[in-house]
Amino acid sequence: QPNPDEFFGLM
């Protein structure tokens, strides 16, 4: 499951 930190890092 993707971590929130990595998800925001893509944005």
Curated annotation (Swiss-Prot):
Localization, UniProt: Secreted
Location of Methionine amide modifications: 11
Protein purpose: Tachykinins are active peptides which excite neurons, evoke behavioral responses, are potent vasodilators and secretagogues, and contract (directly or indirectly) many smooth muscles.
Tissues in which the UniProt entry reports expression: Expressed by the skin glands.
Keyword Secreted tagged: yes
Domain of life: Eukaryota
The protein, known as: Substance P-like peptide 1
Protein species of origin: Pseudophryne guentheri (Guenther's toadlet)
Entry keyword set: Amidation, Amphibian defense peptide, Neuropeptide, Pyrrolidone carboxylic acid, Secreted
Family: Belongs to the tachykinin family.
GO CC annotation terms, alphabetical: extracellular region
Residues annotated with Pyrrolidone carboxylic acid modification: 1
Origin organism lineage: Eukaryota, Metazoa, Chordata, Craniata, Vertebrata
Keyword check for Transport: no
GO biological process: defense response; neuropeptide signaling pathway; tachykinin receptor signaling pathway
